[in-house]
Amino acid sequence: MGVYSRAVAFSVFVSFLLFFTAYSKRNDGTFRVGLKKLKLDPNNRLATRFGSKQEEALRSSLRSYNNNLGGDSGDADIVPLKNYLDAQYYGEIAIGTPPQKFTVIFDTGSSNLWVPSGKCFFSLSCYFHAKYKSSRSSTYKKSGKRAAIHYGSGSISGFFSYDAVTVGDLVVKDQEFIETTSEPGLTFLVAKFDGLLGLGFQEIAVGNATPVWYNMLKQGLIKRPVFSFWLNRDPKSEEGGEIVFGGVDPKHFRGEHTFVPVTQRGYWQFDMGEVLIAGESTGYCGSGCSAIADSGTSLLAGPTAVVAMINKAIGASGVVSQQCKTVVDQYGQTILDLLLAETQPKKICSQIGLCAYDGTHGVSMGIESVVDKENTRSSSGLRDAGCPACEMAVVWIQSQLRQNMTQERIVNYINEICERMPSPNGESAVDCSQLSKMPTVSFTIGGKVFDLAPEEYVLKIGEGPVAQCISGFTALDIPPPRGPLWILGDVFMGKYHTVFDFGNEQVGFAEAV
């Protein structure tokens, strides 16, 4: 799937827009920005869809280039966030002396800081966003090193510079960042942000630049190597959320955090267990999946096989996959018989001739880099068109066998799923009146089950007879050994307060309040 299609897959349409209204300082030295919301009606959906889609195009593009906490927050610095349509959370930073203000995405899925340059003359998008002017800053230092961040339909480019970066009340000295001088296309023109501040590990930083977060620690600006996210999903609240640098804010979560170790530096990636629908195992992650906690992704992205099962369970719209139906019609009974004969599931599709490998191949994770993406294409060239459909059918049949379904019921079930495959455009509508009948979807992390109720994974636009509802799940397929992979975006982080513990290299989740 290309970046444009992937962008649509992450589009979210909800009902409000936030603007900064006031600034305030707390006695403990933290910094907050007051927020308010401007409600949007469903008639604005097309316009907001376009903007959100382009923002997610950028997120996917940038990502494709890159390879016992408690107490009060008195020693922490708090940055409030602006919630744009529940699709993205923004905050304000400043660069230079005197400070030049920018609205940025605080993104745990990347590691660079970039903003438009005052030297960006030939990209229309630069004229619609705040631009950094080095000549106006007494703390500016020249680097001269060129920078380019590639994405599916082009790239943004510019050069590195150094200056003071203000985040809340913290001033990070001599921070390396990218001044962009070329921002082609509509992606950046319609974006609601000026730039991006990455909170991932340095391993995925373009140009090996030191991330802002690293310099906060090196310069002794915070006492604890921890930051945490609270994303407010309450449509009636004026607060969009907040990041706490240096700790956590106890008033935004209840109970204890469940921590899991980071398994691969770069992204905040960890091992995840089974995914459950109404308490029943989907079987897909029985032997483990990887997951990334990503504040820059709006929805929950996961393997098509599981998202299709969720679609069916919640009655989501989808598309009919003729390839899927053909495989089920011709090989469904054979796959069922082989599973009943206890054939190793990973070998079934190669055994019946639909896949040219036996499930033990290795393919680079497309999320890491453009080069890896090309390698993935060439590696997967061996696969026949029916191979992915066969692999999904194996998963679906296994899940039904575990529930002791009859053979006739199993064949009907997988045929029904073939008619509810996730749309290439990513949008899956659901019936708002059926929310109370939809199942809980759960994720197993660190041995604990984290539930999402229908009202938490379904995004509602408008009220009354004009209300529209969209599923918060979208498809993303990453093959082994990097996958299967889930990206736990804002839909998940909105329900669960998230701690990014840099010192112990772990991620923690607790119920948000």
UniProtKB/Swiss-Prot annotation:
<keyword id="KW-0645">Protease</keyword>
<feature type="disulfide bond">
    <location>
        <begin position="324"/>
        <end position="418"/>
    </location>
</feature>
<feature type="disulfide bond">
    <location>
        <begin position="120"/>
        <end position="126"/>
    </location>
</feature>
<feature type="disulfide bond">
    <location>
        <begin position="285"/>
        <end position="289"/>
    </location>
</feature>
<keyword id="KW-1015">Disulfide bond</keyword>
<dbReference type="InterPro" id="IPR033121">
    <property type="entry name" value="PEPTIDASE_A1"/>
</dbReference>
<feature type="glycosylation site" description="N-linked (GlcNAc...) asparagine">
    <location>
        <position position="404"/>
    </location>
</feature>
<keyword id="KW-0865">Zymogen</keyword>
<comment type="similarity">
    <text>Belongs to the peptidase A1 family.</text>
</comment>
<dbReference type="InterPro" id="IPR033869">
    <property type="entry name" value="Phytepsin"/>
</dbReference>
<dbReference type="GO" id="GO:0005634">
    <property type="term" value="C:nucleus"/>
</dbReference>
<dbReference type="Pfam" id="PF03489">
    <property type="entry name" value="SapB_2"/>
</dbReference>
<dbReference type="GO" id="GO:0005773">
    <property type="term" value="C:vacuole"/>
</dbReference>
<dbReference type="InterPro" id="IPR007856">
    <property type="entry name" value="SapB_1"/>
</dbReference>
<feature type="active site">
    <location>
        <position position="107"/>
    </location>
</feature>
<protein>
    <recommendedName>
        <fullName>Aspartic proteinase A2</fullName>
        <ecNumber>3.4.23.-</ecNumber>
    </recommendedName>
</protein>
<feature type="signal peptide">
    <location>
        <begin position="1"/>
        <end position="24"/>
    </location>
</feature>
<feature type="disulfide bond">
    <location>
        <begin position="355"/>
        <end position="387"/>
    </location>
</feature>
<keyword id="KW-0064">Aspartyl protease</keyword>
<feature type="disulfide bond">
    <location>
        <begin position="432"/>
        <end position="469"/>
    </location>
</feature>
<dbReference type="GO" id="GO:0006629">
    <property type="term" value="P:lipid metabolic process"/>
</dbReference>
<dbReference type="InterPro" id="IPR008139">
    <property type="entry name" value="SaposinB_dom"/>
</dbReference>
<dbReference type="InterPro" id="IPR011001">
    <property type="entry name" value="Saposin-like"/>
</dbReference>
<keyword id="KW-0378">Hydrolase</keyword>
<dbReference type="Pfam" id="PF00026">
    <property type="entry name" value="Asp"/>
</dbReference>
<keyword id="KW-0926">Vacuole</keyword>
<keyword id="KW-0677">Repeat</keyword>
<feature type="active site">
    <location>
        <position position="294"/>
    </location>
</feature>
<dbReference type="GO" id="GO:0000325">
    <property type="term" value="C:plant-type vacuole"/>
</dbReference>
<feature type="propeptide" description="Activation peptide">
    <location>
        <begin position="25"/>
        <end position="71"/>
    </location>
</feature>
<feature type="disulfide bond">
    <location>
        <begin position="349"/>
        <end position="390"/>
    </location>
</feature>
<comment type="function">
    <text>Involved in the breakdown of propeptides of storage proteins in protein-storage vacuoles.</text>
</comment>
<feature type="domain" description="Peptidase A1">
    <location>
        <begin position="89"/>
        <end position="510"/>
    </location>
</feature>
<dbReference type="GO" id="GO:0006508">
    <property type="term" value="P:proteolysis"/>
</dbReference>
<dbReference type="InterPro" id="IPR001461">
    <property type="entry name" value="Aspartic_peptidase_A1"/>
</dbReference>
<dbReference type="InterPro" id="IPR021109">
    <property type="entry name" value="Peptidase_aspartic_dom_sf"/>
</dbReference>
<dbReference type="InterPro" id="IPR001969">
    <property type="entry name" value="Aspartic_peptidase_AS"/>
</dbReference>
<keyword id="KW-0732">Signal</keyword>
<dbReference type="InterPro" id="IPR008138">
    <property type="entry name" value="SapB_2"/>
</dbReference>
<keyword id="KW-0325">Glycoprotein</keyword>
<dbReference type="GO" id="GO:0099503">
    <property type="term" value="C:secretory vesicle"/>
</dbReference>
<feature type="domain" description="Saposin B-type">
    <location>
        <begin position="319"/>
        <end position="424"/>
    </location>
</feature>
